[in-house]
């Protein structure tokens, strides 16, 4: 049996990278019947939130939710998880660059330590765990296809 999950993610930041910045991440699980369940997470104040940190945090949140769902199931189905993001950075991190960075000791082609290494490594570890029970696919979508997750991020930041 295959258990399918589709998760839409988004991250946002106000005051990107500056002192006093606020950020949030959201993940929206869309069920087969069209209904959805959503979660948000406020970013910590340190390191200062950025849009990129928010987008990777959203990926981590989605991976955590998928693993949590797998642990709740009575059976051990093959998991098929698709994570959607409107961030080309987040999708690139999870599909291409992460493998090169890991091989290069977390340095980029210019020899600089990669930004957001802590979150990217966390996402990589969660991805590895999910790969043990199924497949994870990362898909870029245009912003207008991600309105619910975007709205949830903004609501979270409004409440901070």
Question: Where do the protein language model's features map onto the residues?
Answer:
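RNase H-like nuclease fold core
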Residues: 1-53, 64-71, 156-159
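RNase H catalytic domain
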Residues: 16, 61-153
């Amino acid at each position: 049996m295959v258990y399918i999950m589709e998760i839409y993610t988004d991250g946002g930041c106000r005051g990107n990278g500056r002192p006093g910045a606020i950020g949030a991440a959201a993940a929206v699980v869309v069920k087969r019947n069209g209904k959805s369940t959503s979660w948000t997470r406020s970013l910590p104040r340190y390191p200062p939130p950025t849009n990129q940190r928010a987008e990777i945090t959203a990926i981590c949140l989605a991976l955590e939710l998928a693993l949590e769902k797998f642990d709740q199931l009575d059976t051990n189905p093959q998991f098929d998880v698709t994570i959607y993001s409107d961030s080309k950075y987040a999708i690139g991190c999870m599909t291409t660059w992460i493998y090169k960075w890991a091989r290069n000791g977390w340095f980029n082609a210019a020899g600089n330590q990669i930004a957001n290494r802590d979150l990217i490594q966390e996402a990589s570890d969660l991805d590895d765990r999910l790969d043990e029970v199924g497949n994870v696919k990362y898909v870029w979508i245009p912003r207008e296809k991600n309105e619910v997750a975007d709205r949830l991020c903004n609501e979270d930041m409004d409440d901070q």
